[in-house]
Amino acid sequence: MKLYYIDRKTGERKEEIVAGDRYLKWMYGTASGNSILELIAKKKIFSSVYGRLQDTSSSKRKISRFIKELQIDMDEAERRNPEEYKNFNDFFARTLRKESRPITKDPEVLISPADGRVFAYEHIDMNKVVQVKGSTYRLMDLFQNNELAREYDGGVCMVIRLCPADYHRFHFPDGGVVNYTKKIEGNYYSVNPIALKKIAQIYCQNKREISLFQSNNFGQMVLMEVGATCVGSIVQTYKEGQSVEKGEEKGYFKFGGSTVILFLKKGAVKIDRDLIENTEKHIETKVHMGEGIGRI
C-alpha cells in the first residue's frame, strides 16, 4: 500500500518514503507476522532492547545510509556531518538550526508543535474520535479520565504523525504553563497508516504521555505524545509548572515513528481550512514545527 500526503508548501500530492515498508506489510498483513507482532513486537521489552541498541557506538554506522535512503536534508541540522553524532539515537533526536524552523510570533496563531503529517478534526464527538476512516475511539479511554474527556467534547483534535525521516523533537504550540504530565503504560504498536487500519484504538492501547497545558491564548489544551514500535522512550525536557514560550522545546522521541496529538476545547481555535479539507479527503498534510495551523 502506497502512502500519499499533501506538501503544504506546494500543494502537490507526494508519495511517502516508508522506512521498513516490507516489514510493516508482513507484520500487519500476514498471519505469521501478526503472531510475531502480538507475541513480541508490541511488547515494551522489544522496543526497550531495540532502543538500547541505538545508543551503542556501533549503531552510528547506520546513519549515512539512513540519511540517503530517506532523503533527509542535513542542511537543516545544527550538526550537519553524520560523523558528529555519537550513536544513532543521538542523530535521530538531532536538533535543528533556528532558521530551519521559524516560529510564527502572532499571538493569535496556533503553531504546529512538531514536523509530521497531520489529520485535523473539528467538532469531535468524545465517544467517536476518528483514528482512520471507519475506526474510532473514546476520549475517556484515551485520557483515562472521564471528566477531562467531557471537557473536550465538541472541540478540536489534531493528530501529527512523525515518520522516521522527520525531526523528532516536539515543542509548545503556544506560550503557557504545563500543569502536569501523566504517563500511561501500554503497547508499542506502529502508528503507520498500515497499522492504524488493522489495529483498533491504537492510541488508547499504546504507551502515551498526557500533558495538561494552560496556554496564553487558546485556553487549556491537552498535549499528548504516543509511543510506537521501536520508540526507545519519550523524553520530556521542560520543567513542570514553569512558564514556557511559544515554540520552546517540550521533549523528544528516541528512535521510531511516533505521534503527537493536540486537543483544544470547543471554540478555542479555528483550524486552517486546507488541513480540514485534506482530512475530509482522507489525506494527510505535511506540516513543520513553528508554522501556523490555526488561529483564534
From Swiss-Prot:
Chief localization class?
membrane
Cofactor list: pyruvate
The modified positions for Pyruvic acid (Ser) read 258
Q: What is its EC number?
A: 4.1.1.65
Output the Pfam families linked to this UniProt entry.
PS_Dcarbxylase
Q: Does the keyword Lyase apply?
A: yes
Q: How is the cofactor bound?
A: Binds 1 pyruvoyl group covalently per subunit.
Site Cleavage (non-hydrolytic): which residues? 257-258
Q: Which residues form a coiled coil?
A: none
GO molecular function annotations of the record: phosphatidylserine decarboxylase activity
- Membrane topology per record: Peripheral membrane protein
Q: Cite a single GO BP annotation.
A: phosphatidylethanolamine biosynthetic process
Example GO CC term: the record gives: plasma membrane
What residues form the catalytic site here? Answer: 115 (charge relay system), 171 (charge relay system), 258 (charge relay system), 258 (schiff-base intermediate with substrate)
Q: How is it modified after translation?
A: Is synthesized initially as an inactive proenzyme. Formation of the active enzyme involves a self-maturation process in which the active site pyruvoyl group is generated from an internal serine residue via an autocatalytic post-translational modification. Two non-identical subunits are generated from the proenzyme in this reaction, and the pyruvate is formed at the N-terminus of the alpha chain, which is derived from the carboxyl end of the proenzyme.
Q: Where in the cell is it found?
A: Cell membrane
Which keywords does this Swiss-Prot/TrEMBL entry list?
A: Cell membrane, Decarboxylase, Lipid biosynthesis, Lipid metabolism, Lyase, Membrane, Phospholipid biosynthesis, Phospholipid metabolism, Pyruvate, Zymogen
Which pathway does it serve? Phospholipid metabolism; phosphatidylethanolamine biosynthesis; phosphatidylethanolamine from CDP-diacylglycerol: step 2/2
According to UniProt, the reaction catalysed is:
a 1,2-diacyl-sn-glycero-3-phospho-L-serine + H(+) = a 1,2-diacyl-sn-glycero-3-phosphoethanolamine + CO2
Tagged with keyword Lyase: yes
**Summary of subunit composition and partner proteins:** Heterodimer of a large membrane-associated beta subunit and a small pyruvoyl-containing alpha subunit.
Protein name listed in UniProt:
Phosphatidylserine decarboxylase proenzyme
Name the species this protein comes from: Alkaliphilus oremlandii (strain OhILAs)
Q: Which gene encodes it?
A: psd
